[in-house]
């Protein structure tokens, strides 16, 4: 009888201990969840304020280029998510097995919080905790991805390249993770301004990507890179690929791909092409840019009067695009200079 009660007592203690452990893990999961909320709120603020500069070649990875998009940086969000991650790490540091995933999640949250707050060295320390482990799990590869971006941002290009090349030799990496690695390699070539290598890398990234939005972006950057290399026939092919991608046709990239293509196919397009674009409600906020490309098309065909009309229409509608305003004034100068109206041309020279 005594033995029976002894067994019951031991089982009860084990159950109580297990319940306490599960409650602790559950509590830390809630902390991580709240930390992710703070992190994502800060990231969303940055993404919503970020705008691609289509007058230059756009970056491959948006999230690696959004940290300067707000004058009032959302540091508070990232500090709060960092605090949540540290709290989990401190309270679960002695747990093993069932808790290890939570520890890794906490270090990943810690690294990302510091990354978006532009504290790259301390972010690197957090990711290295995960990367020192032997098992190449999905979270390991995600930490590797973020570490690579840190190397790129610190201009440690050779270190980023060598580590990526070594990792890409692993034929067991999933398609999704291969896409991340090739995007990282492409971002590296973008930052270095190595456009032939960027084209080559992005073509590989597209083969492994499941995101139609990222595929459209990759095709667009390939086309921009070909234009930069004066390979306009190839650029036309990839602008068309970007347009044909089954992604959101209300995106800025979709519009700009059509406009860039109009430059390369100027003899094939007439005023109806641009008027149709101007009539579409989705292009209402971009009418100044459409008028500008309309003007370029007319100018290339020698229709200087039509070009001037469209340039002046563009000028009336420009909001905060300083690059566009400069281009419009420069083109107005050219139009009047070519017509030998030097007095009118001089009015735009210093505008």
Short names for language-model regions:
Residues 2, 19-351:
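Acidic, polar-rich low-complexity tracts and alpha-helical solenoid repeat scaffolds
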């Amino acid at each position: 009888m005594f033995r029976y009660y002894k067994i019951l007592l031991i089982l009860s203690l084990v159950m109580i201990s297990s319940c306490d452990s599960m409650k602790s893990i559950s509590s830390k999961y809630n902390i991580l969840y709240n930390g992710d909320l703070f992190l994502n709120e800060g990231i969303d603020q940055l993404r919503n304020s970020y705008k691609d500069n289509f007058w230059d070649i756009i970056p491959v990875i948006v999230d690696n280029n959004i940290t300067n998009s707000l004058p009032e940086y959302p540091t508070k969000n990232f500090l709060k998510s960092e605090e949540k991650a540290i709290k989990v790490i401190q309270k679960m540091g002695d747990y093993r097995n069932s808790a290890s995933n939570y520890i890794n999640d906490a270090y990943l949250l810690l690294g990302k919080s510091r990354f978006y707050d532009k504290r790259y060295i301390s972010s690197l320390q957090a990711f290295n905790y995960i990367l020192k482990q032997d098992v190449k799990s999905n979270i390991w590869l995600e930490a590797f991805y973020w570490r690579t971006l840190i190397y790129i941002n610190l201009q440690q290009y050779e270190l980023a390249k060598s580590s990526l090349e070594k990792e890409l030799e692993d034929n067991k990496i999933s398609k999704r993770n291969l896409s991340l690695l090739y995007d990282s390699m492409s971002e590296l070539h973008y930052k270095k301004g190595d456009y032939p290598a960027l084209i080559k890398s992005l073509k590989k990234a597209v083969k492994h990507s499941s995101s139609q939005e990222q595929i459209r972006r990759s095709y667009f950057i390939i086309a921009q890179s070909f234009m930069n290399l004066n390979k306009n026939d190839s650029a036309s092919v990839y602008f068309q690929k970007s347009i044909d991608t089954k992604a959101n046709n209300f995106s800025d990239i979709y519009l700009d791909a059509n406009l860039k293509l109009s430059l390369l196919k100027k003899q094939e397009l007439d005023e109806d092409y641009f008027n149709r674009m101007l009539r579409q409600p989705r292009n209402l906020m971009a009418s100044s840019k459409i008028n500008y490309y309309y003007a370029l098309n007319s100018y290339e065909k020698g229709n200087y009067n039509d070009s001037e009309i469209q340039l002046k229409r563009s000028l009336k509608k420009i909001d905060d695009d300083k690059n566009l305003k400069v281009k419009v004034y420069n083109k107005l100068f050219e139009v009047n200079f070519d017509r030998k109206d030097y007095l009118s041309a001089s009015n735009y020279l210093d505008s």
